Design a protein with these regions (language model features):
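Amphipathic, hydrophobic N-terminal targeting peptides for secretion and organelle import
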Residues: 1-29
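Hydrophobic alpha-helical membrane segments, chiefly transmembrane helices and signal peptide h-regions
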Residues: 11-20, 39-48, 123-127, 157-159
Length: 180
């Protein structure tokens, strides 16, 4: 014979179910989905490529300012100002780091292996920057690990910081000063 649960017992069981965390909350993954990671990587790569291109001497350089948004990702005013300073400095440092220092003739940068993690309103993207700069009959290739920090507000994502992770790395497309 089955005894019916008293009303109070049933209420306690239902309340316990409501208070217990759901299994979805327990499996909350901090990794950012691949589409957003790609979006962040494109935005970060655009800034690095612009700095790399500043190393190559051009007679009629495109003098547009740093973008305020790339691929739907806003660039914070502080990061944009830092990028402008970096580009101006790099335009004057366009010699290969070899004896005789011929001028750079080409530069290409790409970010590979990007992995983004969300923590609260912050997304951190870590990736390897691969830069190739050409001069005369030679080239210099560098691989440097970088971290980019983004803040989110609703659906809007803003790039708020960037730094090199390897303490001894001296990327060719980075300004000399510590203001970044």
């Amino acid at each position: 014979m089955v005894r019916p649960w008293p009303g109070a017992g049933l209420a306690v069981v239902l309340a316990a179910c409501l208070v217990a965390p759901s299994s979805a909350a327990l499996r909350d993954d901090p990794d950012v989905d691949p589409d957003v990671t790609r979006q962040l990587t494109i935005a970060a790569n655009t800034l690095l490529q612009r700095r790399s291109e500043a190393l190559v001497q051009r007679h009629q350089r495109d003098r547009t300012s740093a973008p305020s948004e790339v691929y739907g990702v806003r660039i914070s005013p502080r990061v944009a100002r830092s990028q402008e300073r970096a580009v101006r400095e790099l335009e004057n440092r366009n010699r290969a780091p070899v004896e005789g220092g011929p001028a750079f003739t080409g530069a290409r940068t790409r970010l590979d292996g990007g992995h983004a993690v969300r923590e609260g309103d912050r997304i951190t993207l870590e990736a390897v920057e691969n830069t190739v700069v050409r001069y005369g009959s030679g080239e210099v290739t560098q691989s440097v690990r970088r971290r980019f920090v983004f803040r989110t507000r609703g659906q809007q994502i803003t790039l708020v910081g960037e730094r090199v992770l390897d303490p001894d790395a001296r990327p060719l497309n980075d300004p000399v000063g510590p203001d970044r």
